[in-house]
């Protein structure tokens, strides 16, 4: 592993994007801070950037940089202290027979078809349900860091879920997961996070990075179901108290 003093942070540049419509809070404008150049952001550098609140989309490494808004809060699960609740144990038992296959980033039409079905069912009208093959590949199949693609299949080979995961020096970063939208209450997403937690435990890694949590966004509320959760606030990772979903309505 590269020593932190050897990482090329002094040669990285950071710039702010122009404002664009926020994907999570209606009527808000968002901005991002982008780390460049991408060819210097290897696995070691990216691990350090994630600890500072960055994420990636393809080879685009960014963090929220919005004017007058700090709603996006980076969160991570403390793996060693996690204890599943009753509904999570049900999801674990329900899908324990799924067969997993961990591979390098590869395009398969079967994956792309499942991606479109997922987007159409879960995020219709948001734009991603119209993603071309090229847009899908740029979003999920381009990476300069240590990334894995994980398939989840039934015994008969039916594809149920695909997850893109980055391997960091202190944990796993959940990049994106898409799954069969039918039936709607199958809890595939919950099972996926439980699977990642189990993988991190096996690798003796302390954290699962879940990206950003927004208190006012119902789409993000599932993340607080995985406790204990830490949040990056004012430059420090501190415990995030359990949030009552009713309090955000």
UniProtKB/Swiss-Prot annotation:
It catalyses: N-terminal L-glutamyl-[protein] + L-leucyl-tRNA(Leu) = N-terminal L-leucyl-L-glutamyl-[protein] + tRNA(Leu) + H(+); N-terminal L-aspartyl-[protein] + L-leucyl-tRNA(Leu) = N-terminal L-leucyl-L-aspartyl-[protein] + tRNA(Leu) + H(+). One of its GO terms (biological process) is ubiquitin-dependent protein catabolic process via the N-end rule pathway. One of its GO terms (cellular component) is cytoplasm. It is found in: Cytoplasm. Pfam families: ATE_C, ATE_N. Functions in the N-end rule pathway of protein degradation where it conjugates Leu from its aminoacyl-tRNA to the N-termini of proteins containing an N-terminal aspartate or glutamate. Its main location: cytoplasm. NCBIfam families: PRK01305.1-1, PRK01305.1-3, PRK01305.2-3. GO terms for molecular function: arginyl-tRNA--protein transferase activity; leucyl-tRNA--protein transferase activity. Keywords: Acyltransferase, Cytoplasm, Transferase. It comes from the Bacteria. Its EC number is 2.3.2.29. This is Aspartate/glutamate leucyltransferase. The gene is bpt. Belongs to the R-transferase family. Bpt subfamily. It is an enzyme of class 2 (transferase).
């Amino acid at each position: 592993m590269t020593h932190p003093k050897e990482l090329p942070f002094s040669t990285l540049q950071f710039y702010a994007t122009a404002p664009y419509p926020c994907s999570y809070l209606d009527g808000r404008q968002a901005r991002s801070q982008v780390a460049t150049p991408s060819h210097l952001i290897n696995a070691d550098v990216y691990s350090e950037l994630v600890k500072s609140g960055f994420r990636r989309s393809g080879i685009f490494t960014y963090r929220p940089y919005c004017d007058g808004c700090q709603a996006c809060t980076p969160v991570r699960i403390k793996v060693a202290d996690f204890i599943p609740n009753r509904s999570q144990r049900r999801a674990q038992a329900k899908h324990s027979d799924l067969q997993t296959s961990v591979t390098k980033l590869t395009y398969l039409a079967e994956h792309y078809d499942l991606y479109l079905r997922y987007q159409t069912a879960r995020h219709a009208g948001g734009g991603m349900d119209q993603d071309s093959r090229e847009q899908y590949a740029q979003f999920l199949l381009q990476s300069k860091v240590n990334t894995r693609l994980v398939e989840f299949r039934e015994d008969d080979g039916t594809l149920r879920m695909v997850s893109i995961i980055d391997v960091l020096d202190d944990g796993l970063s959940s990049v994106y997961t898409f799954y069969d939208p039918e039936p709607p209450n199958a809890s595939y997403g919950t099972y996926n996070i439980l699977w990642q937690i189990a993988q991190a435990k096996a690798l003796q890694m302390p954290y699962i990075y879940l990206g950003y949590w927004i208190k006012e966004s119902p789409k993000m509320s599932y993340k607080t179901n995985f406790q204990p959760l830490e949040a990056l606030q004012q430059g420090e990772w501190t415990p995030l108290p359990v949030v009552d979903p009713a309090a955000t309505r």
